[in-house]
Amino acid sequence: MAADKPHMNLAVIGHIDHGKSTTVGRMMFETGAVPAHIIEAYRKEAESKGKATFEFAWVMDNLKEERERGITIDIAHKRFDTPKYYFTVVDCPGHRDFVKNMITGASQADAAILVVAAPDGVMEQTKEHVFLARTLGITQIIIAINKMDAVKFDEKRFNEVKKELSDLIKMVGYKPEETLFIPISSLQGINIKANSPETPWYKGPALIPALDTFKEPSKPTDKPLRLPIQDSYSISGIGTVPVGRVETGIMKKGMKVSFMPANKDGEIKSIEMHHEEIPQAVPGDNVGFNVRGIAKGDIRRGDVCGPAEQPPTVADEFTAQVVVLQHPSAITVGYTPVFHCHTTQTACTFIELKKKLDPRSGQTKEENPTFLKTGDAAIVQIKPTKPMVIENVKELPQLGRFAVRDMGSTIAAGMCIAIQPKQMR
């Protein structure tokens, strides 16, 4: 059913306990993505426990308990269909690797739903997630004002929260006038699949129909080819077969290519996807390809393949805009954590802290700060300890974002805004 529909990755973001999982669960439930036999099993159990009314929240609690017990109904890769799209819900914040995944492209979201609880309004993580979504290039967002049942579906409260959110999203560059704000109750299923009589004052679409107002993400086929290598195999009788996903541009048979920072050249002999030979590969395609002139030891994970005439950019240094997500103390000049960018993991040094920014408005708050701490946004100068490919986020955003990791956690997220390239030839 999904093959002929465009696919979108959807991030569900918002403050803890504002109802993200319940909203995802409810959307899956309403679109028929939670198998009937699971619902039936819960219904029977509910009856046996004397819960005459079968409540959706109870299903969600059970799913949660089962996850805690280690029995997974695969809510990690949650997918559901709308009339227009099929959606995969990518890791929601709260998962440790959410930020890293979002940035390194393991789950680059095309759009987001921001869930905000009506009684609370904008909270700390609401701000952080909105800022991150914007920093990470999510241009389309729908706002679900949840737990409307807790405020008796009061239009006045809805409008107060809407105003607060409009101010917040405007600061980071979303347009409130083009954004849908939907009053919902995920627990009660209000305004999820269809408009409810509980909110006669609300004239917009319910949440699931609203998802079909998202624009289909365009494939960056007009950009130069960039294919970060995930792995490289040596296959007898064929030769070297690198494997990876096309991020931008088009790979064609017969094309002359360069691998950076390995600084090796070759020619594409054949391209394969799902064990079938294809004449060309476009963004989103996971392919294996055979290259004439390349030996197995020449290239490795983290190298990037591009056209010989427009090879991938190797940075000697680069300027980045970063947001510090969590650091036990402070980041100072000389700090050298690992940068995860496309498929590379390279240790890089903070060589200059240029300025601290107001994370919400992007205005300069302080020139040449001495340190950065959790919650700070800044412009910094970075020097990789060994050659690595990174691109300017304005030109090739897919290779311009990165996560900064240290001691097993994501310290910061960022994007490359200028590069001092290394001359490779």
UniProtKB/Swiss-Prot annotation:
Segments for region (G5): 185-187
Family as reported in the entry's similarity comment: Belongs to the TRAFAC class translation factor GTPase superfamily. Classic translation factor GTPase family. EF-Tu/EF-1A subfamily.
Start and end residues of each stretch annotated as G2: 70-74
Source species: Methanoregula boonei (strain DSM 21154 / JCM 14090 / 6A8)
Positions of the UniProt region annotated as G1: 14-21
Keywords from the named record: Cytoplasm, Elongation factor, GTP-binding, Hydrolase, Magnesium, Metal-binding, Nucleotide-binding, Protein biosynthesis
All copies of domain tr-type G, residue ranges: 5-221
Residues that coordinate or bind GTP: 14-21, 91-95, 146-149
NCBIfam families found in the cross-reference section: EF-1_alpha (TIGR00483), PRK12317.1 (NF008969), small_GTP (TIGR00231)
Top-level lineage group: Archaea
Any one GO molecular function term: GTPase activity
Function: GTP hydrolase that promotes the GTP-dependent binding of aminoacyl-tRNA to the A-site of ribosomes during protein biosynthesis.
UniProt: Mg(2+) binding residues: S21
Listed CDD domains: EF1_alpha (cd01883), EF1_alpha_II (cd03693), EF1_alpha_III (cd03705)
Chain segments carrying region G4: 146-149
Protein known as: Elongation factor 1-alpha
EC number: 3.6.5.3
Catalytic activity, as annotated: GTP + H2O = GDP + phosphate + H(+)
Cellular compartment(s): Cytoplasm
N-terminal signal peptide: none
Region G3: start-end pairs: 91-94
Pfam families, sorted: GTP-eEF1A_C, GTP_EFTU, GTP_EFTU_D2
SUPFAM superfamilies in the cross-refs: EF-Tu/eEF-1alpha/eIF2-gamma C-terminal domain (SSF50465), P-loop containing nucleoside triphosphate hydrolases (SSF52540), Translation proteins (SSF50447)
Main location: cytoplasm
GO annotations of cellular component type: cytoplasm
